Amino acid sequence: MTKPNSLIFYCIIVLGLTLMKIQLSEECELIIKRPNANLTRVPKDLPLQTTTLDLSQNNISELQTSDILSLSKLRVLIMSYNRLQYLNISVFKFNTELEYLDLSHNELKVILCHPTVSLKHLDLSFNAFDALPICKEFGNMSQLQFLGLSGSRVQSSSVQLIAHLNISKVLLVLGDAYGEKEDPESLRHVSTETLHIVFPSKREFRFLLDVSVSTTIGLELSNIKCVLEDQGCSYFLRALSKLGKNLKLSNLTLNNVETTWNSFINILQIVWHTPVKYFSISNVKLQGQLAFRMFNYSDTSLKALSIHQVVTDVFSFPQSYIYSIFANMNIQNFTMSGTHMVHMLCPSQVSPFLHVDFTDNLLTDMVFKDCRNLVRLKTLSLQKNQLKNLENIILTSAKMTSLQKLDISQNSLRYSDGGIPCAWTQSLLVLNLSSNMLTGSVFRCLPPKVKVLDLHNNRIMSIPKDVTHLQALQELNVASNSLTDLPGCGAFSSLSVLVIDHNSVSHPSEDFFQSCQNIRSLTAGNNPFQCTCELRDFVKNIGWVAREVVEGWPDSYRCDYPESSRGTALRDFHMSPLSCDTVLLTVTIGATMLVLAVTGAFLCLYFDLPWYVRMLCQWTQTRHRARHIPLEELQRNLQFHAFVSYSGHDSAWVKNELLPNLEKDDIQICLHERNFVPGKSIVENIINFIEKSYKSIFVLSPHFIQSEWCHYELYFAHHNLFHEGSDNLILILLAPIPQYSIPTNYHKLKTLMSRRTYLEWPTEKNKHGLFWANLRASINVKLVNQAEGTCYTQQ
């Protein structure tokens, strides 16, 4: 048992170390990119751990060993588009890990070889070599997958040096002088899966080179120019006819073709009868007329034809002829893009077309109208054309009974909902209507079994309630419209992917996730979210779903309103439940008011709060009135701050409470027993000292109303109040006086007590301080001549 366990443990250790080594290797990748930096030499400050070095598009003219000697970890070196003229491969002898070397688009004329075996990618194309730069050392590059060469002379002897290598792709760029000493069989020994030959771009194609390399699966020929009618593109047609010898050839690509219409049809006809299965022609310039001829569609291996970017002169022949050639091709896949095609005929019989792509043309929505011979068609792309009426497309699709995918995006389609039957083909599963002029009415007529629907970049403001019930719809893209809410899944019960970013969604429905139980991907970012109470539940629901469901969260989900929250991520947006729940807010306010009311009632009952409030108001009013009385009026002949009138029964309170608390602040109080002048009548003394006092204080109590002299003093003071218009009466209620106990002849006292505010003597000692402060404030004024005595009267 011990030995097997030890073996297992050892294997685990080895596996862990191997994984760690791989991880460290990946983490140690150091890529240095300095393209287009006007460098004339390889920089000297390169890090020693550099693994990828890109020095393309500079002015480097020389590469020395010392330039890269220290870069022992270098695996990728890109020096294309420089000015290298000479190269000694020995400069890489210390870069034993070098695998990728790109020296294309330089001025190399001479190359000196050195043994190297690690290269997988070597590109010497687009240089100034006379003969192909193939050394015998190249034969040792057993790992070589890509080889780019260039030269004006191609000799079999050079090619034989690498004939035994199984290279995935060979790029051969022929110089402008190619053809002077041409060896037609020079490529016979090339062993590669993909061969790309670039012919001289400015010369007529009059080459004898045999391009039918026996091992080639994919062949690409660039710069084909044959426009001279006397030759009829015979050289190139002869080269194509030899392709029939290579039974392995499956892919043929022609780039940058300039020829006549007749030669173009001849090229198609020759390729039609070769082993080629996939034929692509791009960047074509056509001229001249097209002579009528029958096209032979029989005996072909071709499955797909792609024609891209065609420029032609003004047609001088009926276009229907060329359209009929294309329409009746017996292939499965047909692509014509960027050809300015304005129409396409319906095949004359049931077509084998499975996939048709007419992207970027000038087709109208009348294309294939009433065509019943495309019943096998599965995919149709009419992207970037001149389609305007969706109803016509609907009627056309109805006859394509096998159509599963339709792309009519980037047109000017409208849907008027004008009563035309919604007759989409029942087989349609994928529909792309993006970048058109469609509104929400399009939802009333959609293929019933569609699974993927793309409506982004239209003019949809809302999804009508009476939409077509798309029970099979799984993916819906309505991005870049004007929708104001997330659509529910009532009509889309199988919806799993929704893209609705860049709309006008401000308050997403809180029940979206409840309605769309099958949603697994939601992209709703970059909308003008209004961060208010209505958004809280939606943000909360996002927190309940898996993070990978909401695409772009949280970076693409930010507040747009209010201004104070603009730019804030919805994840960081918070509002208190109190501000958003009306019931809770009402209950909280009611409870708060109740607590305040109870607290106020308690304060009133326990601390007699109303009394304090009244005293404070009186003190404030007194201070306010004092500031508005002219100083001259106050100081005219006053000798006392106050004249005090009280009953003899209350004298103890006056002497023990009132006088000590008022006279300690230099306040002069007039009492009759201290200041009345002997010999004068009592009435004369009362009148005289009331006039010499700033205020008259009356200490009211049940004893006061029983005193006759107190009544006189009150009468004269009240008379003085109305005579001079002053506010000199202060009433102190020492003890409560019931209204019924006041004699009828004391009508002035009744009037004063009912109209004027009086000070009520508090029985609680803690209130005495405020009482005396209020009283002092009401009588405290600066006297010009301070009386030496104090006047008070006792009755």
UniProtKB/Swiss-Prot annotation:
Keyword Signal: yes
Subcellular location per the Swiss-Prot or TrEMBL entry: Cell membrane; Cytoplasmic vesicle, Phagosome membrane; Membrane raft; Golgi apparatus
Disulfide bonds listed in the record: 113-135, 226-233, 346-371, 422-445
InterPro entries: Cys-rich_flank_reg_C, Leu-rich_rpt, Leu-rich_rpt_typical-subtyp, LRR_dom_sf, TIR_dom, Toll-like_receptor, Toll_tir_struct_dom_sf
Sequence ranges assigned to domain LRRCT in this UniProt record: 524-579
Topological domain ranges for the Cytoplasmic compartment: 604-795
Keyword presence, Phosphoprotein: no
GO biological-process terms attached to the record: activation of NF-kappaB-inducing kinase activity; cellular response to triacyl bacterial lipopeptide; defense response; detection of triacyl bacterial lipopeptide; innate immune response; macrophage activation; microglial cell activation; positive regulation of interleukin-6 production
Protein function: Participates in the innate immune response to microbial agents. Specifically recognizes diacylated and triacylated lipopeptides. Cooperates with TLR2 to mediate the innate immune response to bacterial lipoproteins or lipopeptides. Forms the activation cluster TLR2:TLR1:CD14 in response to triacylated lipopeptides, this cluster triggers signaling from the cell surface and subsequently is targeted to the Golgi in a lipid-raft dependent pathway. Acts via MYD88 and TRAF6, leading to NF-kappa-B activation, cytokine secretion and the inflammatory response.
SMART domains cross-referenced by the UniProt entry: LRR_SD22, LRR_TYP, LRRCT, TIR
Main location class: membrane
Region (Interaction with bacterial lipopeptide): 316-319
Transmembrane region(s): 583-603
GO cellular component, one term: membrane raft
GO molecular function: identical protein binding; NAD+ nucleosidase activity, cyclic ADP-ribose generating; Toll-like receptor 2 binding; transmembrane signaling receptor activity; triacyl lipopeptide binding
Topology feature Extracellular, residues: 26-582
Subunit structure: Interacts (via extracellular domain) with TLR2. TLR2 seems to exist in heterodimers with either TLR1 or TLR6 before stimulation by the ligand. The heterodimers form bigger oligomers in response to their corresponding ligands as well as further heterotypic associations with other receptors such as CD14 and/or CD36. Binds MYD88 (via TIR domain). Interacts with CNPY3. Interacts with neutrophil recruitment protein from Aedes aegypti saliva; the interaction promotes activation of canonical NF-kappa-B signaling in skin-resident macrophages and subsequent expression of neutrophil chemoattractants.
Classification via Pfam families: LRR_8, LRRCT, TIR
Sites carrying sugar chains: 38, 59, 88, 140, 166, 251, 296, 333, 432
Domain TIR: 638-779
UniProt similarity note: Belongs to the Toll-like receptor family.
UniProt signal peptide: 1-25
Protein name: Toll-like receptor 1
LRR repeat feature ranges: 54-77, 78-101, 102-125, 126-150, 151-175, 176-199, 200-223, 224-250, 251-278, 279-308, 309-337, 338-361, 362-388, 389-414, 415-437, 438-457, 458-478, 479-500, 501-524
